[in-house]
A protein has these predicted regions:
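Divalent metal-coordination and catalytic microenvironments
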Residues: 7, 22, 27, 47, ...
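Active-site neighborhoods of metal-dependent hydrolases
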Residues: 121-124, 129-132, 136-156, 162-183, ...
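N-terminal metal-binding scaffold of metallo-dependent hydrolase/deaminase domains
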Residues: 1-37
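Acidic, Ser/Thr-rich peripheral helices and adjacent loops at domain boundaries
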Residues: 98-111, 290-299
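Glycine-centered short loops/turns at secondary-structure junctions
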Residues: 76, 204-205, 234, 267
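Hydrophobic, small-residue-rich alpha-helical packing segments that form membrane-like cores
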Residues: 85-94, 106-225, 229-232
């Protein structure tokens, strides 16, 4: 038996925090109260808070969970949902990151691959992650696996292959599918392609979670697209990090909430999550037009080295921008690290 002594308990119910002791036997709490004398191993929690484990429903710790990293558990997070925003570590193949720009966030070895969910979960078990992990299957990763970085609709055979692989991943424990519809190749999928995949997920009891196609000028249309998938398939819909990007679009939040309430009245099972702060985090490539990313990072660099292409990319980027470049701050780069902490306007002035 163990006792957590003199801690401040915050139980998540909204009740006022209280100071108390907690008795533990095995993996269970057996009593809560004041126990001045008890035969148990004592853990001194003076000046510490005791809380239920936090569930981080929108995490990108897919790779870190395989590295026995302790940052999350030290912040009270005991369970995480990974595979968000259209990219997961499975199904993958060597050099997938060259086809999927968003995949570079994981900093994986180019030779690494996880053919399916089972391969990833087996790796998790052997590496003994500190947190419990539930993983979505990334629709962008899935699409790159069967079609590469090409634009356009999946052909009939590619669709069959994608559905088979998705069904297998769900049977192996994936909890649903995620999209990252303002990142390629996820963005190349149209509504009908997404519905085809969502139907497979719904049959297996999973959910559809979406990094929407747009959070700026086409925010309302992007939300409506996700809700339509819920209407037509019956699948539960999770709207990821719901936000209106750019001051010109802030007023749209009220309109979006009206759309969501209307969908709920129609029977759509819809929920949302949001940042607890005023900044978002993404790769800088999300600022670029989708066509410039077709073919992956190698093709993007080739286009940027072409003066005419670079001019067109700059013009299209400006046309779709909702914030000033002073609002975009570099938080991490592998080279020229002196740029970390500077905004894009400052970097442009330096260059």
């Amino acid at each position: 038996m163990k006792i957590l002594k003199n801690g401040t308990i915050i139980d998540g119910s909204g009740k006022t925090r209280t100071k108390a002791d907690i008795l533990l036997e095995g993996q269970k709490i057996t009593d809560i109260g004041n126990f001045p004398s008890v035969d148990a191993e004592e853990i001194d929690c003076t000046n510490l808070c005791i809380i239920p484990g936090i569930v981080d429903i929108h995490s990108h710790s897919d790779l870190e969970s395989l590295q026995h990293r302790s940052e999350k558990i030290k912040q009270g997070v005991t369970s995480e949902v990974v595979g968000n925003c259209g990219f997961s570590l499975f199904p993958s193949k060597p050099n997938l990151k060259n086809m999927l720009p968003a995949f570079e966030i994981f900093d994986t070895d180019p030779t690494q691959k996880w053919d399916d969910a089972d391969a990833y979960f087996s790796d998790l078990d052997s590496k003994k992650s500190y947190t419990n992990i539930a993983s979505l299957t990334g629709q962008g990763t899935l699409r790159a696996f069967v079609k590469g970085a090409k634009s356009g609709a999946m052909d009939p055979q590619e669709t069959i292959n994608a559905c088979k692989i998705l069904a297998k991943c769900l049977e192996q424990g994936s909890v649903g599918i995620s999209t990252g519809l303002n990142e390629v190749p996820s963005a190349y999928a149209d509504l009908e392609e997404l519905i085809t995949l969502a139907e497979i997920v719904h049959e297996k009891g999973g959910l559809y979670t979406s990094h929407l196609r747009d959070y700026k000028f086409r925010f309302l249309e992007a939300v409506e697209e996700a809700l339509e998938i819920g209407r037509r398939t019956g699948i539960p819909v999770q709207l990821s990090h719901l936000q209106a990007v750019g001051q010109k679009n802030w007023h749209k939040i009220d309109l979006v909430l009206e759309l969501i309430e209307k969908a709920e009245l129609e029977g759509v099972d819809v929920a949302m999550d949001a940042y607890p702060y005023l900044a978002g985090s993404c790769k800088l490539t999300q600022s670029l037009p989708g066509w410039s990313l077709e073919g992956g990072t190698v093709e993007l660099i080739r286009r940027l080295n072409n003066p005419e292409m670079r001019k067109r990319i700059a013009e299209d980027t400006e046309e779709d921008r909702s914030n000033t470049w002073k609002d975009v701050v570099v938080s991490n780069v592998s080279m020229e690290r002196e740029m970390i902490g500077k905004n894009i306007q400052e970097i442009a002035d330096i260059c």
